[in-house]
Amino acid sequence: QLVHTQIDLEMSFCDEEDVFAIVEGIISAAFKAVNGLEVKGPFPRLSYDEAMERFGSDKPDLRFGMEMRDLTDLVTESDFSIFREVCASGGRVRGLAAAGCAHFSRKETDELADIAKIYKAKGIITLKVEEGQVKGSVAKYLSEDAQRGIVKRLQAADGDLIIMVADDPEVSAISLGQVRRFLGRKLGLIREGDYKLLWVTEFPLFEWNPDENRWEAKHHIFTQPREQDLPILESDPAGVKGRLYDLVLNGVEMGSGSIRINKPDLQKRVMKIIGTTAEDAERKFGFLLRAYEYGGPVHGGLAIGFDRLIAVILGLENLRDVIAFP
């Protein structure tokens, strides 16, 4: 497509390490050609679970810190009803410390709450750190041990603003992650010309669709599950991780790929979990399943959005500035 350029790799007899090595070489060459920067591999790696726990995003921006922490165990027994109810229902209380932001006005904290609400959170809870103690309307409901534990876990210091979200596990992570992202820009924590690359790996293979009351493939149905998860494929789809990986640059997904299924029996198992009948599998994918009966090589790949990559390297916000026919 003239309006969109993609570098698509399809490789046989490969594993993740082979794909990573080739892509890191491509990215290093692109940086050198576009702006003369030396970017060397191997790039850092985070599992999907770790990225969500620490940054509230599957494409985290590593150009600044302000990492999130799970505070659930510290507030489970608190007298604050919201904390207690969220913990009892299996939710999570997560927090971060915004350095030097205890002076934030009500208008500024309301702005943070509005961002969290966009991502389905009911709101935020804020505490200020003064002389090693937390101050705020919720502080009186927290024991001294809980207060000290929160300050220690978040590595908060005097003058910091502690921001917490108590909600469903996914909502609390994503909404607080977006607050973190906003603060990174608002506080000027991102240096111009700074580039942070990483791989995010081991995404969930399936996600639940409550509207249709069934499992769906999080990316696509041809992704190979991790071998250690095969025993729980049918019994615990939520716990199955795929051999999936994304390349992330400065909080933007640059490319996505996976190691594919190459065995017909495994492909049929995955199809069955998402509700594909044997008849539909044959009608839609019979050619593929029959081909695998003859033996297909282990294969995988990745696709890089070339225009997006160049835009981020050049520090441009709009893809129209780098494509041939905008």
Describe each model-derived feature in a short phrase.
Residues 1-326:
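Class II aminoacyl-tRNA synthetase catalytic cores and aaRS-like
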